[in-house]
Amino acid sequence: METNVVYHLDFLRNKLPDHCANLIIADPPYFEVKGDFDFTFDDFQHYLQHVEAWAKECARILAENGTLIWWGDYRRIAYAQIILDKYFNLLTNGVWLKINGRTRKCSFREARCLVNNTERFLVYETKSKHGENRSFYSPNAGNFFEGYEPLRQWLRAEYKSLGGVGQIIKRTKNNFYSHHTSRSQWSFPNPKNVEELLPLYAAKGVDIEKKRAEYESARKEYEKQRVEYEKQRAEYRAKRRPHFGELYKLRSVIPFDQESHLTRAYDFPTKKPPTLTRQLIETMSREGDLVVVPFAGSGTECAEAKRVGRNFIAYDIDARAVKMATDRAAAVQHEPKLAI
């Protein structure tokens, strides 16, 4: 699969394999807002039919741990959300507040509207076959605990033979044992803990040297299982959906400059600010991920994905947009972040 290319092709005719996209950034026509492409639909219902087709195709290619960003107009995005909710699980919605946007009404139809200087976006994740939200972790949780289970059960039996956790805490004055054998959160007794337990065995007439040897053997098995667990944990971190951390402290309303000093270089009616686009990409994907752009437009998403070390594949039916996006991405070099 060739990456970092803009195809002169309708997105619905793409040849991408299923579940290949780690991040999809869809900035589709808004319907009769701006640009010739916004006025090509017979009516609003015809437009919504296209939204449904785009949504289905995005659902097909979105990875199981992937994220979808869907841009829209403040009047129309609610209708798109109803459709998108059928195919994805909604994570959040956001508002780009244009801090240098227009401050007055520009048409008669806005006479009874508040001045709008925002654009909206929805953020989705994949939905399971049964419709509920299922992360990578949920169906695989048992794999993380399975290796430890014999040790955990052995430890529970040992504690029970000493009178139970309550008696152990009472006699050792150590609350460490209170959650020591839960399924998802526990750790093996360290040498100090074992020395606390041995007198309890002695009080019951048990050979403490034999028990010390048993604990040492079990500890070695625990360390062996822990190595395997850490390996699985690293694999899980690589596969799970990226957490939307505090890299840029983004909130649901994002005040942001339109960056006209940068975007004016590209003759296209609908352009997003490069810096905001880059911050969303970094927040919702990892380096090396594949970003799919169904509507390339001026190429903002393509260029910024490349700048931060992601691969991209983009589509547009406008030959002029394809050339613009291709040239724009080609001019960008990956700019790795300096370690701090």
Kindly label every feature range from the protein language model.
Residues M1-Y315, R320-V322:
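Core catalytic lobe of class I
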Residues A325-T326:
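Conserved SAM-binding loop
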Residues A330-I340:
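Positively charged, low-complexity nucleic-acid-binding target-recognition regions
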